[in-house]
Amino acid sequence: MSEILVVKLGGTTIAEQSQVLEDVAAVARRRPVVLVHGGGKRITEWLERLGVPSKFEGGLRVTDQQSLEVAAAVLRGVVNSELVAGLRDLGVDAVGLSGVDGGLLIAERIPHLGLVASVAGLRRDLLDAILVAGQVPVVAPLARDADGIVCNVNADDAAAGIAVGLGARQLVLMTDVDGVRDAEGRKLETLTVAEAEHLIEAGVIAGGMVPKIRAALSALGWEGAEAIIADGGADRALERALSDPSFGTRITAAREASVGAA
């Protein structure tokens, strides 16, 4: 099997993601792809309709039982189904599942965030079976902890955990910004582990970008591995993220100074 690519998308509407889905479909015809998706904005919208406030700590959603039920319904029932249908309309044999299905994701609870967990492991055989069959797994970020309780998982963390578990050397995190910026606001084309940690400590990287960067760093355990943060709304976003070094920000384990800012 060719080199596996793990791609994380946000949870915006299919209309907003039609271009990137076409990119995913094109790449999936050439190499195995695992698609992981979020749904934060749409979860917040549904919670607002129900009069439930959203609370975040360190860029991560604090999740109680009511919020979890909404998150699970939106992630698995709405967003996942839309993405699978969208890919199948493009001729891709996509299969939808969550980290709960088959015990795909092994989760470790983050107590201070409520019903939230990080990824501690992966049942690789499940994804391997789907990929070997020529299908594209579309994964919703839900998982059960050691007590069997279903938890919300940050989608970036889920994607990184899957990348590590599969030994994938490329992880693409699609977001709504064009990359990581330095203290002067310049977009960085490359970023090393040390540089990323420094920018976090200095408060330059803040809010929801922090867990995204942390997830990217956790995926760099393989030689030659890279995580790419790119604007999923840009034209040909995935194709450019994979082929154009100036598109987005590439994060590597290299210790040398970065190429610089754009």
Describe each region flagged by the PLM.
Residues 1-262:
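C-terminal catalytic "cap/lid" subdomain
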